[in-house]
Amino acid sequence: MKNNIEVSVIGAGMWGSTLAALLAKKGCSVRAWEHNPVMAAHLLDNRTHSALPGFRLPANVRVFTELEKAVVSPDLLLMAVDSRHVRALARAIRPLLEGKRLPHIVAVSKGIEAGSFLTVCEIMEAEIPRAKRRTMIMTGPSFAVELAAGAPTKAVLAGLDQAEVKKTIKMLEGGPLKLEPCEDRLGAELGGSLKNVYAVGSGII
């Protein structure tokens, strides 16, 4: 059932494709951007993802290699690219949002920028200043491959404005995905960024 929520997913990797599929199944109108034309063509032609066994991308997910076609007038924008590319993409997205209603922005990417030591949400806000109260992070002990397979998945959605967080949870969660609101955005981002470091360290010890 269509719900009139417009979604832009930036990055059609494992997390981007998984969340695009979940939101499309909820009835959202989903536009995904993928920089790799070969991957974009594969998703469009085959509706499968090489890293997600058994995954099917719903037919109502549109995939583009042109950013301006993926970011038209979204209610929800998901940033699901490698953290190294967040600043350049946020800078390119900013003019596409000018004069329009600001979407709820959710970072799925995790990482800290070299040199500035800014988190993904902080980078987004630096490049899109009016997004400060609407930029959130989704993080937790979760894996895209499990969510794509339909496994019950729980994560937190952390942001500075809890009213905005709760509105975004209503848009984003559904099916096997359950989200809990969180006020500590910085803590959530740092925890998500450092968890792999801790895992490697634990393995060495």
PLM features per residue range, with description:
Residues M1-R56, V61-T65, A92:
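NAD(P)+-binding Rossmann beta1-loop-alpha1 motif at the extreme N-terminus of oxidoreductases
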Residues V7, V30, R133-T135, L179:
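Hydrophobic anchor at the start of a short beta-strand
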Residues A12, H35, V108-K110, L160:
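Cofactor-binding loop segments of dinucleotide-utilizing enzymes, especially the Rossmann-like FAD-
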Residues F64-V72, L76-M79, S83-P152:
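Rossmann-like NAD(P)(H) cofactor-binding subdomain of soluble oxidoreductases
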Residues H85, L96, I123, E127-R133, ...:
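Internal alpha-helical scaffold of NAD(P)-dependent oxidoreductase catalytic cores
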